Curated annotation (Swiss-Prot):
Reaction(s) the record says it catalyses: L-seryl-[protein] + ATP = O-phospho-L-seryl-[protein] + ADP + H(+); L-threonyl-[protein] + ATP = O-phospho-L-threonyl-[protein] + ADP + H(+)
Tissue/organ expression: Expressed in roots.
Membrane topology (Cytoplasmic): 725-1091
Name recorded for this polypeptide: LRR receptor-like serine/threonine-protein kinase RGI3
E.C. number: 2.7.11.1
Gene field: RGI3
Family: Belongs to the protein kinase superfamily. Ser/Thr protein kinase family.
The keyword Protein biosynthesis is assigned to this record: no
Segments on the Extracellular face: 25-703
Entry membrane topology: Single-pass type I membrane protein
Keywords assigned: ATP-binding, Cell membrane, Disulfide bond, Glycoprotein, Kinase, Leucine-rich repeat, Membrane, Nucleotide-binding, Phosphoprotein, Receptor, Repeat, Serine/threonine-protein kinase, Signal, Transferase, Transmembrane, Transmembrane helix, Ubl conjugation
Top-level division of the source organism's lineage: Eukaryota
Length: 1091
């Protein structure tokens, strides 16, 4: 190569070398790539970010200003799995907008975020950021939008937030923030949106200064622990459109100044403890669209002025204490779509003017005192989908015009005094899924037109005076799942066409006058519950019964069925209860009955004509609790029954059994009435009474006395300690400033804080518990209150739980919370004073003597069962009590039970048809409850469910039956009550020996009840939660125990040979029993609570 050419080539290469930096990525791009390198990126989200580019301005998610400086970064919806890039991006001095949302970022927000002084928008929402909000953020004077919502941020909202004078939007919702809303919030004059809801530990009052935020459009503080009154300054928010502070702890009245919020469209204050009346000034809000005030403690009348809000489409005042009538002015609300006034004390009639609301879709006025007739002009409501008016005092006919509401999906008019027939036109409603008319005075026939209602899912017509036959057209209802037409005057046969109801699971036709054969009737295979009892059905039981493999309960008692029991019944593998009593069955009892392993509740074959011996396979019915084969012609011995370890009730009377009665404690303690009229049966003298307690060994007596002395001494020392502590606390209280108390009353009570404080002395202590000490205090009106003072001023969890739970539920067997008050040092709860103490004190304490007889004990445990069933099955979401024990069952003036102490109560987020899976794993809960009553899953830290309450209730049942505390020191070897009972039954000892000696001398029928209740208790205390019954099933079993042969005297039973008449019931009384449903944070969708 010539020298000149060589030199030219060299200098060209050298020139290119020195000019390479001019075409490389600038410092901003390198900073972005540095952050990118720290992320765990999947996919091609950053495929446009090339190192070969000279500038990042064309990269996805990056924008630059005119000078080529990065001004905006916007990245959303990627799984980056890294930390915030603040350190890496320090060079981006011109950054005005930083959006890093839904990127799965972790770690804390770095303090260096405050260095980006040009930022106007900072959005770090929907990540997994933790730690406190750094105060350095509030150095960003130009910030207009701050979105930190949906993270795991903790700590307080810094007072320095007031420095952001230009802030327009502040989004802090769905974090773990605590403390109070700082008063400096009032410095944000330009703020339009404030959302900080979903922070459960955000507490204190809404500061008065919030009224300074006059540009506010949206105020969202829902699902927090904000308490106290809404400040009157809220009336300064002239531009606010939505106020959402629901599911919190607000108290006091709604300020009249709310009427100055003239732009308000949505007011959501439900699920609080707001009291007073609904302000009439709300009627001046011409733009108001949604008004949700349900589940508070509002009183007084519904303001007629609300009829002046022309845009209103949703009103919900349910679960309050409202009185008066439904305002006629509501008829002016042409846009009204939903009116929900359930569970109040509203009286008067349904105003006809309401039918002018032609857009109405939901009309829910159930659980009130509404009288009169249903307006015939209901036909105007062509958009109506739900009409609930159950548990009122409505009279007259169901208007035929209701059938013109073509969109109706659910009608519930139960528990009224409606008469006349069911309009056949109702069944022309093709969208109707639920028709509930139970417990009225309806008559006439079920029209054949029912077959047109093809979407019907639930039908309840029970407790009326309906006559005629069941129309065969019912077979057209392919979606029908639940049918209850019991306690009417129906005649004729069960239509074979019912086999067409292929989705049917529950069929109850008991107490009618149905007749005819079952042979031609093929029942749907989907059935789980059948009750045809107390009718006049004849013929044999068809072999097809074995096709019902899902069946759990079959009751055919009190009919005229004959022939043999088909052996195919053994294929009903899920059967738990079988009642064929009081029929005309004959032949031998099939051996196949012993092949049904699930048969655990009851097997009743009494009052038939069975012959032969008890099948040998009956020895396999290990879980059976009740067996009744009385009033038959059975022979042989009873040895096959000796292995039934769970058997607590057996009636073999009026047969021809022979041989020796098995020599086991259970058989020795059977009442003679359950063995009577078996001529060949040899009954030894050992079947008489318990051993005389005076024959006990004297050393045992001395040991017992010693234990009692020691226990008494311990109790005295504990009492002294409690009284001293109470006196010291009382002295401290007297020094408190009266004006520092926050007070909320749910009932009208006339007293001052001083009236309470000065009486919190040791002389007034009536009890202590895990969460506090309880005093009896008489207020100036002469009324006595029970006042609970929480133990620890720092521990507010139990206090908040009790307010949250008891403040939102009402049930006849749950203690009533009258109000509460608190200050910095103390928290007090006010309850009705119940004069008879607790169930525990009556069973074990110095006050024992009342509530000792079985009848009173039964009423107590049934009442508690109703309370728990209400919490578990009527409340939405389900409420777990968490500390069911005899000490927490209080007794009223007539020993009526009240479940108390909800300091450990919690809700569970699972409910049928919500799409929430209860089986999904959750964080294991901490230990809770009381030792001796806790279910086994507490000790193993398994998931706590409502079945844990069932176990605790079972322990209470055993305590009531045996008279022994769960940790009674007299139990052998220091055993727990459940283990002692379980061992006793496993050893085949006489179950009646388990019963409280104070219950001795009761009649055979009462003894039978007690032993059946023992069987229920044994089911409840199963070690496996999934084997325990639901509380609604416990209620059903206990009710069934008491209702067997109710109303018939012993003399009548003996005259009838122990079996009832086979004649069908022709008439039933017009008098109806109406269950009192409590009000709560529960679904009041329907009046029925059947399985």
């Amino acid at each position: 190569m010539p020298p000149n050419i060589y030199r030219l080539s060299f200098f060209s290469s050298l020139l290119c070398f020195f000019f390479i930096p001019c075409f490389s990525l600038d410092q901003q791009g390198q900073a972005l790539l540095s952050w990118k390198s720290q992320l765990n990126i999947s996919g091609d989200a950053f495929s446009s970010w090339h190192v070969a580019d000279t500038s990042p301005c064309n990269w996805v998610g990056v924008k630059c200003n005119r000078r080529g400086e990065v001004s905006e970064i916007q990245l959303k919806g990627m799984d980056l799995q890294g930390s915030l890039p603040v350190t890496s991006l320090r060079s981006l001095k011109s950054l005005t907008s930083l959006t890093l949302s839904s990127l799965n970022l972790t770690g804390v927000i770095p303090k260096e975020i405050g260095d980006f002084t040009e930022l106007e928008l900072l959005d770090l929402s929907d990540n997994s950021l933790s730690g406190d909000i750094p105060v350095e953020i509030f150095r960003l004077k130009k910030l207009k939008t701050l979105s930190l919502n949906t993270n795991n941020l903790e700590g307080h909202i810094p007072m320095e937030i007031g420095n952001l004078s230009g802030l327009v939007e502040l989004m802090l919702f769905d974090n773990k923030l605590s403390g109070e809303i700082p008063r400096s919030i009032g410095e944000l004059k330009n703020l339009q949106v404030l959302r900080a809801g979903g922070n459960k530990n955000l507490r204190g009052e809404l500061p008065w200064e919030i009224g300074n935020c006059e540009n506010l459009v949206m105020l969202g503080l829902a699902e927090t622990s904000l308490s106290g009154k809404l400040p009157a300054s809220i009336g300064n928010l002239k531009r606010v459109q939505t106020i959402a502070i629901y599911t919190s702890l607000l108290s006091g009245p709604i300020p009249d100044e709310i009427g100055y919020c003239t732009e308000l469209q949505n007011l959501y204050l439900y699920q609080n403890s707001i009291s007073g009346s609904i302000p009439t000034t709300i009627g001046g809000l011409k733009k108001l669209q949604s008004l949700l005030l349900w589940q508070n403690n509002l009183v007084g009348k519904i303001p007629t002025e609300l009829g002046n809000c022309p845009e209103l489409w949703l009103i919900d005042f349910s679960e309050n204490l409202l009185t008066g009538t439904i305002p006629r002015s509501f008829g002016k609300l042409e846009n009204l779509q939903e009116l929900q006034l359930s569970v109040n004390q509203i009286s008067g009639t349904i105003p006809e003017e309401l039918t002018n609301c032609t857009k109405l879709t939901h009309l829910e006025i159930d659980n009130n005192l509404i009288t009169g007739e249903i307006p015939s002009l209901m036909s105007n409501l062509r958009s109506l989908t739900m009409f609930f008016a159950w548990q009122n005092k409505l009279t007259g006919n169901i208007p035929q015009s209701l059938s013109q509401c073509r969109e109706l999906q659910a009608i519930d008019l139960s528990y009224n005094s409606l008469s006349g027939s069911i309009p056949k036109e109702i069944f022309g409603l093709r969208n109707l899924t639920k028709l509930l008319l139970l417990s009225n005075d309806l008559s006439g026939f079920i029209p054949p037109d029912i077959g047109n209602c093809t979407n019907l899912y639930r039908l309840r017509l029970n407790g009326n005076r309906l006559a005629g036959s069941i129309p065969s057209e019912i077979g057209n209802l392919k979606n029908l799942n639940f049918v209850d037409i019991s306690e009417n005057r129906l005649v004729g046969s069960i239509p074979p066409a019912i086999s067409g109801c292929e989705s049917l699971e529950f069929l109850d036709l008991h107490t009618n006058s149905l007749s005819g054969s079952l042979l031609g009737t093929t029942l749907p295979k989907s059935l789980k519950f059948i009750d045809f009892s107390d009718n006049a059905l004849s013929s044999t039981l068809p072999p097809g019964i074995g096709l019902l493999t899902e069946l759990t309960k079959l009751n055919l008692a009190k009919n005229r069925l004959s022939g043999e029991i088909p052996r195919e019944i053994s294929t009903c593998r899920s059967l738990q209860l079988l009642n064929l009593g009081e029929n005309d069955f004959s032949g031998e009892i099939p051996d196949e009955l012993g092949q049904i392993p699930s048969l655990a509740i009851s097997l009743n074959l009494s009052c038939n004509r069975f012959v032969g011996e008890i099948p040998s396979r009956f020895s396999d019915l290990k879980n059976l609790g009740v067996l009744d084969v009385s009033h038959n012609q059975l022979t042989g011995n009873l040895n096959v029954l000796t292995d039934l370890q769970n058997l607590v009730s057996l009636n073999i009377s009026y047969n021809d059994f022979s041989g020796d009665l098995p020599n086991t404690p259970f058989f020795r303690r059977l009442p003679l009435s359950d063995l009577a009229s078996n001529r060949g049966l040899y009954i030894s003298n050992a079947i008489s009474t318990r051993p005389d307690p005076t024959t006990r060994n004297s050393s045992v007596v001395r040991l017992t006395i010693l234990i009692l002395v020691v226990v008494t001494a311990v109790l005295v020392l504990m009492a002294v300690y409690t009284l001293v502590r109470a006196r010291a606390a009382g002295k401290q209280l007297l020094g408190e400033e009266i004006d520092s108390w926050e007070v909320t009353l749910y009932q009208k009570l006339d007293f001052s804080i001083d009236d309470i404080v000065k009486n919190l002395t040791s002389a007034n202590v009536i009890g202590t518990g895990s969460s506090g000490v309880v005093y009896r205090i008489t207020i100036p009106s002469g009324e006595s209150l029970a006042v609970k003072k929480m133990w620890s001023k720092e521990e507010s969890g139990a206090f908040n739980s009790e307010i949250k739970t008891l403040g939102s539920i009402r049930h006849r067997n749950i203690v009533r919370l009258l109000g509460w008050c608190s200050n910095r040092n103390l928290k007090l709860l006010f309850y009705d004073y119940l004069p008879n103490g607790s169930l525990s004190s009556r069973l074990h304490g110095a006050g024992k003597g009342g509530c000792v007889d079985w009848e009173a004990r039964y009423d107590v445990v049934l009442g508690v069962a109703h309370a728990l069933a209400y919490l578990h099955h009527d409340c939405l979401p389900t409420i777990i009590h968490g500390d069911v024990k005899a000490m927490n069952v209080l007794l009223g003036p007539h020993f009526e039970p009240y479940l108390a102490d909800f300091g450990l109560a919690r809700t569970i987020s699972g409910y049928p048809n919500t799409g929430i899976d209860l089986a999904k794993p959750t964080n294991r809960p901490p230990m809770a409850g009381s030792y001796g009553y806790m279910a086994p899953e507490h000790a193993s830290m398994q998931r706590i469910t409502e079945k844990s309450d069932v176990y605790s209730y079972g322990v209470v049942l055993l305590e009531v039956l045996t008279g022994k505390h769960p940790l009674d020191p007299d139990l052998p070897g220091g055993a727990h009550l459940v283990k002692w009972v379980r061992d006793h039954l496993a050893e085949k000892k006489d179950p009646s020996r388990l019963l409280d000696p104070r219950l001795d001398g009761r009649t055979d029928s009462i003894m039978h009840e007690m032993l059946q209740t023992l069987a229920v208790a044994f089911l409840c205390v199963s070690n496996k939660a999934n084997e325990r019954p639901l509380m609604k099933d416990v209620v059903a079993m206990l009710t069934e125990i008491r209702h067997i042969d109710v109303g018939r005297s012993e003399t009548e039973k003996i005259k009838a040979g122990g079996c009832g008449s086979k004649e069908p019931q022709q008439f039933m009384s017009n008098e109806k029993i109406i269950n009192s449903h409590g009000s709560s944070n529960c679904s009041f969708a329907f009046s029925d609570d059947s399985v």
